[in-house]
Design a protein with these regions (language model features):
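Conserved beta-strand
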Residues: 2, 11-22, 27, 53, ...
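ABC ATPase nucleotide-binding domain helical subdomain, centered on the C-loop/LSGGQ "ABC signature"
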Residues: 54-56, 71, 89-132, 176-177, ...
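C-terminal portion of ABC ATPase nucleotide-binding domains
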Residues: 122, 177, 194, 199-240
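ABC-fold ATPase nucleotide-binding domain signature/coupling loops
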Residues: 12, 56, 113-145, 154-156, ...
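Conserved catalytic loops of ABC-family nucleotide-binding domains
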Residues: 181-190, 198
Length: 240
């Protein structure tokens, strides 16, 4: 029963949210802008603490875990991810020792293997044009790199917040088709404004004004003719 308001305000962003994530389940969080999706994710990641209520992992209040121990269980790609002026492999390894096999596997899963082979120094190519010594990635390539970094970490819980926002429709479809493979054996939470992505998930949770409004599968929610069905059908008009 979690509620949250930002400091200095009495306006709840989330109100009386109760839900659980099953191991290995792929869940989509959807809703209109301002529904509370990203805030919920930040609570899960302990970037914020609930105003009331609590969150548990394996039945234990997450505040009882050390912050470092807890965050090792999560691989997260936020909307406002950052890449650094470092070689590509170091961006993906994110401060850990580079495992070449894991690196290549992560690149392959996000469809970057061919692009990396074209880089002047392969995975050792520095990102961003530092006096001509590096390369600038496109928005879509940067987003794929951020997803590769999350997969490289190999944490049991994967969270992707708008992971395909900078991709064109064809590239987006490729990522969706690989979604189950990319998160095989992991618990995954996926946020997207594009309802077409939700078909790839086991479960869809619809947030509306900070509360859970609907919870079910893609087909079930379409049949209910509620918020999800309205969002899905509204977007579908632009693709027909």
């Amino acid at each position: 029963d979690v509620s949250f308001s930002y400091p200095g305000t009495n306006i709840p962003v989330l109100e009386h949210v109760t839900l659980s994530f099953a191991v290995g389940e792929k869940t989509a969080l959807v809703g209109r802008n301002g529904a509370g999706k990203t805030t919920l994710i930040k609570l899960l990641c302990r970037l914020y603490e609930p105003t009331s209520g609590y969150i548990t992992l394996n039945g234990i209040d997450i505040r009882k875990y050390s912050y470092k121990e807890y965050t090792q269980a999560f691989s997260v790609v936020f909307q406002d991810f950052h890449l650094f002026s470092l070689p590509l492999d170091e961006n993906i390894a994110a401060g850990t020792e580079i495992d070449e096999a894991a690196l290549q596997s992560s690149l392959a899963k996000v469809g970057l293997t061919g692009r990396v082979q074209q880089l002047p120094q392969g995975v050792r190519t520095r990102l961003y044009n530092n006096n001509g010594s590096g390369v600038d990635l496109s928005g879509g390539e940067a987003q794929r790199t951020a997803i590769a970094r999350a997969l490289y970490k190999d944490a049991p819980f994967v969270i992707l917040d708008e992971p395909t926002a900078a991709l064109d429709p064809i590239a987006e479809a490729e990522i969706y088709e690989q979604f189950s493979q990319m998160t095989a054996g992991k618990t995954a939470v996926y946020i997207s404004h594009r309802m077409s992505s939700c078909k790839f998930c086991d479960r869809i949770i619809v947030l509306d004004h900070g509360r859970i409004a609907e919870d079910g599968t893609h087909d079930t929610l379409l049949a209910n003719h509620g918020i999800y069905a309205n969002l899905y059908e509204t977007q579908a008009q632009y693709y027909t």
